[in-house]
Amino acid sequence: MHIKTLTVSQLNRYVKNTLDADFILNNASVKGEISNLKIHSSGHIYFSLKDGGSKINCVMFKSYAYNLKFALENGMDVVALGNVSVYEKEGSYQLYVKDIKREGIGDLYVAFEKLKEKLKEEGLFDDVHKKEIPKFSKKVGVITSPTGAVLKDIINVTKRRNKGIELLIYPALVQGTNASRTLIEGIKILNKVEDVDIIILARGGGSIEELWAFNNEELAYAVYNSKKPIITGVGHETDFTIVDFVSDRRAPTPSAAAEIAVFDREVLINEILNYKYNIKNSMENIIKEKRNYLNLYKQKIEANSPTNIIVNEYKNIDNLKELLNMKIEGKLNKEKNNLSRLSSLLEAHNPLNVLKKGYTLIEDEGNNLITEKEALKKLNKINIIFKDGRAKLSIEYIEEFLK
C-alpha cells in the first residue's frame, strides 16, 4: 500500500478541513471552568476551559466578545458555544467561542471568596495593621522559586537600582501541595534574621490553580503576623491572591515588588544634590537678605549719628550762609542800582546844572527861593546865586512884563 507523504502544512490543513466538516464540532457546546484568562488589547479574549480530567484552549474574537453580558473571571463555570478547529500555524486545535453562558462559580473561586470574606471580617486586610515600608532598606529577603525568571528579574532590578543592597534568598516551592508550607517557613526564618529590613514574596503568573498556594489561610496568617514588612508580587497585574490583601504592600509583578523594596541609588544621590543645592541657595538668599537689612540699618544709624547730625547741620549752616550772602549781595546790588538811578535823576534835576547854562537863582535873605515877582514887593534885598557864587543886591524897582 502506497502512503502519500504530506507536508506539515498539508497535514494541518487536512485535519482542519476534517474538523470543520464535522457537524457536532461545528456546533459544539462545551461546559467547563475558565482558567488562564487573558483579555488582549485588541479586544480578543483567550482562556482555557477545564474539568477534572482535561482542558481545551479557547479564543473569543472581539466581534463576539463585544456581546458578552458579564465579565469573565478565572474559576467561573460556563458553557461555551462555538466550533472546534485547528490553528494551522501551530498545529493545535482550539474552541472558537461565539457565545458564553454562565453555568455557575467554580469550586476554587467559591473557596477563594469564602476565605477572603472570613479574613476580611477578622480585620486582616485593615490598613491599620499595615506595616510601613522602609524607604532605605539595606538587606531584602526574597521568598520565591530558586529557578525561573522571577528571581532573575528581582536580581536584575536590584542591581540596576542599587548594587549596595544585599538580597537574602529563601528558595521555596511556589506551586503544588507543599508550596504553602515552604512559603510559611520562609517567612518564619527571614523574620529571625535581624538585619533583614523587608521581605518580598513573589511568583510569576499562572492560572488560579497554579497560584492557589498563595490563597492558603495559614500563609495569610503568617504574612499578617510577620514582624518584617512584606511586599507581595504574585502573578500579573490582573492576578489577585489572598496574601495580596493581607500583605503590607501589593505589587502588580515581582519586578515591581523589587522596585518598591530597593531604593534607587542614583535617584537618592540626585535628591541629595538637589537638597544641597536648594539649601545652599536658601542660605545665600537668607544671608543676602540679612546683609541688605544690615546695610539698611547701618545707613539709618549713620544717618542719625551725632557726628552726621552735626556735619549735616554745618552743611545746612553753610548753605544758609551762602543763601544769605546771595540775598544780601542781591539786595545791595538792587539798592546800588536804585541809588545810581536816583543819583542820575537827582543830577538831572540839580539846579546847579541849570546855573551852568547861564541862569541864576533868587533867594530872600532867609535863603528861600523866589519864583514870582510878587514876592519881591515885600523885600528890600535879595541874594543872587550864580554857578560859582552869590551876591546880595538891593531892589530899586520892579518892572512888570506885558502879557
UniProtKB/Swiss-Prot annotation:
Keyword Protease in annotation: no
Similarity remark: Belongs to the XseA family.
Superkingdom of origin: Bacteria
NCBIfam families: xseA
A family per Pfam: tRNA_anti_2
Organism: Clostridium botulinum (strain Okra / Type B1)
Record-linked HAMAP family: Exonuc_7_L
Catalytic activity from the UniProt record: Exonucleolytic cleavage in either 5'- to 3'- or 3'- to 5'-direction to yield nucleoside 5'-phosphates
Protein name, entry field: Exodeoxyribonuclease 7 large subunit
Role this protein plays: Bidirectionally degrades single-stranded DNA into large acid-insoluble oligonucleotides, which are then degraded further into small acid-soluble oligonucleotides.
Subunit structure: Heterooligomer composed of large and small subunits.
Catalytic EC class: hydrolase
EC number(s) stated in the UniProt entry for this protein: 3.1.11.6
GO-annotated biological processes: DNA catabolic process
Lineage of producing organism: Bacteria, Bacillati, Bacillota, Clostridia, Eubacteriales
Cellular localization per UniProt: Cytoplasm
